[in-house]
UniProtKB/Swiss-Prot annotation:
The gene is wzyE. It comes from Pectobacterium carotovorum subsp. carotovorum (strain PC1). It comes from the Bacteria. InterPro entries: WzyE (IPR010691). Belongs to the WzyE family. The chain crosses the membrane at residues 6-26, 39-59, 65-85, 112-132, 154-174, 180-200, 201-221, 222-242, 340-360, 377-397, 408-428. This is Probable ECA polymerase. It is a multi-pass membrane protein. Pfam families: WzyE (PF06899). Pathway: Bacterial outer membrane biogenesis; enterobacterial common antigen biosynthesis. Probably part of a complex composed of WzxE, WzyE and WzzE.
Length: 463
């Protein structure tokens, strides 16, 4: 990359970032937080945050990168995708109606508490089973890729560890105080550190716990944007340190700075992977929607499907094995746009942008239902569901459409099943006479008593 080529790329980069940041800032000023703001920030992080790191690696350390024309193609396609996404998200499909509708879901106090207890039980039980089978893998494995080897049993259980976070989200949304907010951080980070040591380097639960803590703080006004930036910088350094421990690296001096640059870029902003796909575009055999179906294979136990393929050819594995010819045992993230390119080439990019806009719109709709519901237990469940799905939005932007679809379906099924079991348990307890009603009076004593004072409303709560 020459200085002239860098200058051209920088102009395109600057225009793209200003365009997306302007739209995101206007949305933030309007609502402070919604899933469009979240997706936009994650999108900026994935496709634009890594550009300065790439430039420093090129000019400071002489690292070879993808030819400039493909870097430019990656940047332009990312900007075009966001423009189509934004139009899709903002397009109103039907008129707003003020007519109240009958609630499709009702949740009481007992059901809400049973739901988070079941979610937490799933997470703790699967962590315990994984630990009994494998011990502390962080101190046993010589390399991170060994996690996916046959020596480690019960790898599929890792997908259940995450449900500890939605459980703690329900607890927080039932109270929504600063103390509950801080307890959410302490509990989820402690659990994340435990899973990091047991699994041998998986940082996802830690990243999500910290990110959700920040998002909640922004929503409630407990932290400012400057505090968010400072926390983000702290998070980047923390993730770098955990990455060093994960890969067993001991670095110092210039090499430490070099390692920080490429690990941070690859962790938070694998945008060069999209450029690699454009470079190898003529070698790609479009997979259609097959990667989405294949990604569900990992959720099917081998005892139920004895002939289940051990190697799943989703978009990440196709990119790693077929495009990069990399068989190290780790799957390299193709990003959201990369997965669309693998599935259907250029034509899938606008179609994917429209679909993603509708998905984000749906999450915002559910989130608004939760915020505005008068039943605080139902509101807690709906908001915890939405915030719990943040991990799936991260998967969407970083890993791709196929990984997102399988994970969001899995998340909805487990979360919905816990709520259904909670309702069933409540019905059984109530039928057995173990649920007693607690009467709470909402006292609103007028300053001057009058004969026409309306009696205090009585609200029933289940214990």
């Amino acid at each position: 990359m020459t200085l002239g080529q860098f200058g051209g790329l920088f102009v395109v980069y600057l225009i793209s970032v200003i365009f997306i940041l302007s739209l995101t800032w206007m949305e933030f000023r309007r609502v402070r937080f919604n899933f469009n703001v979240l997706f936009s920030l994650l999108y900026l992080l994935t496709f634009y945050f890594g550009f300065p790191f790439t430039c420093v690696l090129v000019f400071r350390f002489g690292v070879d990168v993808v030819p400039v024309q493909f870097l430019l193609q990656a940047m332009l396609s990312a900007t075009a995708f966001y423009a189509i996404y934004y139009v899709s998200y903002k397009t109103r499909l039907r008129q707003k109606t003020s007519v109240p509708r009958a609630p499709l879901l009702t949740v009481n106090r007992v059901e809400a508490n049973l739901t988070w207890l079941l979610l937490a039980l799933i997470a703790v039980a699967t962590v315990g089973i994984f630990f009994l089978n494998n011990g502390f893998l962080l101190f046993k494995l010589r390399s991170y890729s060994q996690i996916f080897s046959s020596d480690v049993s019960g790898v599929a259980l890792k997908r259940f560890f995450y449900f500890f976070i939605p459980a703690m989200l329900v607890v927080y949304f039932l109270r929504q105080t600063q103390r509950a907010w801080l307890m959410f951080l302490i509990g989820t980070v402690a659990f994340g550190m435990l899973t990091y040591v047991i699994v041998g380097g998986t940082r996802a639960n830690l990243i999500i716990a910290f990110a959700l803590f920040l998002f909640i703080g922004i929503v409630r006004g407990w932290i400012t944007l400057w505090m968010l930036v400072a926390a983000g910088a702290f998070g980047i350094v923390g993730m770098f340190w955990l990455a060093l421990k994960r890969y067993g690296l001991d670095v110092s001096g210039d090499y430490a700075f070099y390692t920080f640059l490429y690990l941070t870029r690859d962790t938070f902003s694998p945008w060069e992977n999209l450029a690699l796909l454009w470079q190898n575009y003529d070698k790609i055999e479009f997979q259609g929607l097959a990667p989405i179906a294949r990604d569900f294979y990992v959720f099917i136990p081998s005892w139920l499907w004895p002939d289940r393929p051990n190697l799943v050819l989703n978009s990440a594995n196709y990119f790693t094995w077929e495009v990069l010819n990399n068989h190290s045992g780790l799957a390299i993230s193709p990003t959201l746009l990369g997965s669309l390119v693998v599935m259907g080439g250029v034509l899938f990019i606008p179609l994917g942008a429209i679909a993603v806009g509708l998905v984000i719109k749906w999450f915002d709709w559910v989130y608004e239902l939760g915020k505005n519901d008068s039943n605080r237990y139902k509101a807690a469940i709906l908001q915890a569901f939405c915030f719990g799905a943040v991990f799936n939005i991260i998967v969407l932007t970083r890993e791709g459409v196929d990984s997102f679809v399988s994970r969001v379906v899995f998340f909805c099924l487990v979360f919905g099943l816990c709520l259904l079991v909670a309702k069933l348990l409540y019905w059984l307890l109530e039928s057995a006479g173990l649920i007693r009603q607690r009467l709470m009076r909402m006292r609103a004593t007028p300053l001057v008593p009058t004969p026409n004072t309306v009696p205090d409303p009585v609200i029933k709560e289940q214990l």
